[in-house]
């Protein structure tokens, strides 16, 4: 799909706010009569023929930079005030009503900001209208100012217009959302959405439930348990959760459905906030190692890694690859990913049209100073020599060895060797990070022989390294772990699961040297990434997967002890990972993984009892394991056409106190909590002696968690 850069409109107004000039800014040579800008000009301002100007306002400018640019564009040397009828720009009222310098009111506090245009004007990528007035023509001339134009901005804009005709803006946005947003969608909006689902008659299952903290409502087609008070859930025809909202957070799996539902109804939902990741595929490859030859800090900030850029406000990160661009945005801004892709493609055309290859030693020496560096007691940086010593043994076409020296010859014929004056770091090896990323063979000096390393085999013997080989470096817990990585467990679980186990690490880093067995975190369990956002999602996953799940400092079990499998999962940034035992020999980089010692956690399972009837009547039996009708477990889907709110049962202080230690550590499935509430309520109303409540509870739930705590 070809990205069309939207036209922009600049309106210069006089004393009566009459339009003196209407500038239609576009990188094209014509007016797009189908654009919203032209419709606004013709229908609302009754302007049929604006001035067509082949220029473009960069949406990355600050307000002061924008003011200087507009003064240059309109050739105004006086103080000016800029504003818009859609969004506040330079000034805003404390209550966020739209500022207009011709109808100023002193009853509200006026705020001035110098933020970035795309932040204060969220729809700027598609529809940008800026009004400009001389300050002396308004009711508040003291609020006007004059800013000099930044010549670098004009220089960049000129180059942008020159290369624009040759840009290939054919792009495809593959993934648009990371599924989690922050908004102010409340009960009114949620009710309107669920009403729309029923009006469309699309046979999607929907559920709107409201409840107090820690209790259960059984409505619709699912048991729902969240710690939030309000929840809307809608399932696709195949039973997949399409979207879910708790009134503050919206999780969207079916973007089209969500867009269709809210497109023409007033949900009272303000601007959505939350991290969003876009992956944009390019029809024409670019140079991912971008180099900016002029000042462009008003657009991007360069980082130490030459394929990563940051926006000027550092809230948007851009990772460049040859055929695609990944863009991570803090808050949702319509089409911002396409706009930044346009800028990246343009800059590539300006400065990086020819991709050059060069020897690492001549171009990327910065990496040696950071990763393979010489210090007072370590001499790890290899030196370049001009010849081989007589009698050196040929190991391969690019590697020679003697008792005193090892020599590596790269593709450009440059010879590297290690000659540590202290006699320690004399073994030639290679930096894994560059080999993994780019297949670069960057030599470095090591204490021990490196010939057993997989990277050595690839660089010296041209033996293909398995793509999914796991790095021996163990990351700190907290980040999502990829297939080639592993990380430590959280401190509390590391101490618990690895009691009596050891892992020997190399000095001064987190590289695993040797272990006969140690619990760590591996990448996502299974082939597909599983994301769990709410407590309800977590409980549903645990009972379907039938394995233990660690979330923060809590452990989730399947409902029944007999269901507990032999795996341990752990949630990191809402992604399910796997806990494994790692084993490694000191003489090899090969890492072996084994199942965890799941029994350590299984022994903490709180409900270890046989099925016991609590009460029965007319073929219905309530037991500690579920609710049965005529001997069959009741698990039928209920109708989702109606919304039902059930009054929650509140347990007595004695019961709450009894179970409180348990729920600090372990929470089981929604049905379990529902049945506990029901069961306790029945017991309390069965003429049980108040002085005998705890012994009665211990009969059905002998392991309350107190034994584990003590």
Swiss-Prot record:
InterPro entries: Poxvirus_early-TF_lsu. It is found in: Virion. One of its GO terms (biological process) is positive regulation of DNA-templated transcription. The keyword Transcription regulation applies. Keywords: Activator, DNA-binding, Late protein, Transcription, Transcription regulation, Virion. The keyword Transcription applies. Its main location: virion. Heterodimer of a 70 kDa and a 82 kDa subunit. Part of the early transcription complex composed of ETF, RAP94/OPG109, and the DNA-directed RNA polymerase. Belongs to the poxviridae VETF large subunit family. Acts with RNA polymerase to initiate transcription from early gene promoters. Is recruited by the RPO-associated protein of 94 kDa RAP94/OPG109 to form the early transcription complex, which also contains the core RNA polymerase. ETF heterodimer binds to early gene promoters. This is Early transcription factor 82 kDa subunit. It comes from Vaccinia virus (strain Western Reserve) (VACV).
């Amino acid at each position: 799909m070809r990205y069309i850069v939207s036209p922009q409109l600049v309106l210069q107004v006089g004393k009566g706010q009459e339009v003196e000039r209407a500038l239609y800014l576009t990188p094209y040579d014509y007016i797009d009569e189908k654009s919203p800008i032209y419709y606004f000009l013709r229908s609302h301002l009754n302007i049929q023929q604006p001035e067509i100007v082949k220029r473009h306002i960069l949406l990355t400018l600050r307000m002061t930079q924008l003011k200087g640019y507009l003064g240059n564009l309109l050739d105004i040397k006086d103080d000016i005030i800029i504003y818009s009828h859609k969004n506040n720009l330079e000034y805003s009222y404390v209550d966020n009503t739209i500022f207009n310098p011709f109808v100023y009111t002193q009853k509200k506090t006026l705020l001035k900001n110098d933020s970035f245009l795309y932040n204060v004007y969220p729809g700027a990528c598609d529809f940008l209208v800026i009004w400009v007035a001389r300050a002396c023509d308004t009711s508040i001339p003291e609020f006007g100012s004059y800013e000099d134009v930044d010549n670098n901005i004009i220089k960049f804009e000129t180059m942008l217009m020159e290369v624009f005709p040759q840009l290939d803006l054919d792009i495809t946005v593959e993934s648009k959302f990371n599924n989690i947003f922050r908004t102010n969608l409340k009960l009114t909006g949620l009710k309107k959405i669920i009403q729309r689902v029923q009006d469309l008659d699309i046979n999607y299952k929907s559920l709107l439930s409201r409840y107090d903290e820690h209790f259960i409502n059984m409505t619709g087609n699912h048991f729902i348990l969240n710690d939030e008070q309000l929840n809307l859930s809608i399932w696709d025809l195949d039973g997949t959760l399409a979207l879910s909202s708790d009134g503050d957070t919206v999780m969207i799996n079916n973007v089209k459905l969500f867009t269709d539902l809210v497109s023409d109804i007033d949900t009272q939902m303000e601007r959505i906030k939350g991290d969003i990741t876009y992956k944009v595929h390019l029809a024409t490859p670019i140079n991912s190692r971008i180099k900016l030859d002029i000042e462009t800090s008003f657009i991007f900030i360069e980082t130490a890694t030459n394929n990563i850029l940051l926006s000027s406000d550092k809230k948007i990160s851009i990772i460049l690859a040859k055929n695609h661009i990944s863009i991570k945005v803090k808050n949702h801004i319509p089409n911002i990913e396409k706009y930044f892709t346009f800028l990246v493609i343009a800059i590539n055309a300006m400065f990086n049209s020819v991709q050059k290859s060069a020897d690492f030693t001549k171009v990327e020496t910065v990496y040696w100073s950071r990763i393979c560096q010489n210090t007072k007691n370590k001499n790890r940086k290899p030196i370049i020599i001009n010849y081989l010593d007589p009698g050196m043994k040929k190991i391969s076409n690019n590697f020679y060895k003697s008792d005193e020296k090892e020599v590596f010859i790269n593709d450009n014929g440059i010879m590297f060797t290690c000659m540590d004056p202290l006699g320690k770091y004399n073994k030639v090896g290679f930096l894994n990070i560059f080999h993994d990323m780019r297949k670069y063979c960057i030599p470095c000096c090591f204490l021990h022989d490196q010939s057993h390393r997989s990277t050595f085999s690839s660089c010296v013997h041209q033996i293909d390294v398995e793509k999914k080989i796991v790095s021996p470096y163990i990351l700190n817990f907290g980040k999502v772990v990829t297939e080639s990585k592993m990380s430590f467990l959280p401190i509390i679980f590391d101490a618990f699961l690895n009691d009596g186990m050891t892992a020997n690490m190399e000095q001064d880093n987190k590289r695993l040297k040797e272990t006969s067995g140690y619990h760590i975190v591996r990448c996502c369990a299974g082939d597909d990434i599983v994301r769990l956002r709410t407590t309800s999602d977590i409980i549903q996953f645990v009972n379907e997967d039938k394995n233990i799940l660690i979330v923060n400092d809590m452990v989730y079990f399947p409902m029944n002890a007999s269901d507990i499998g032999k795996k341990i999962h752990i949630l990191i940034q809402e992604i399910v990972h796997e806990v494994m035992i790692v084993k490694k020999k000191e003489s090899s980089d090969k890492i072996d993984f084994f199942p965890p010692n799941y029994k350590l956690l299984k022994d903490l399972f709180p409900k270890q009892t046989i099925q016991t009837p609590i009460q029965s009547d007319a073929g219905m039996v309530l037991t500690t394991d579920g609710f049965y009708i005529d001997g069959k477990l009741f698990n039928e889907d209920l109708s989702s056409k109606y919304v039902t709110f059930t009054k929650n049962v509140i347990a007595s202080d004695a019961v709450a106190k009894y179970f409180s230690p348990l729920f600090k550590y372990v929470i089981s499935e929604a049905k379990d909590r529902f049945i506990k509430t029901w069961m306790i309520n029945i017991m309390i109303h069965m003429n049980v002696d108040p002085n005998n409540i705890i012994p009665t509870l211990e009969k059905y739930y002998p392991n309350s968690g107190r034994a584990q705590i003590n």
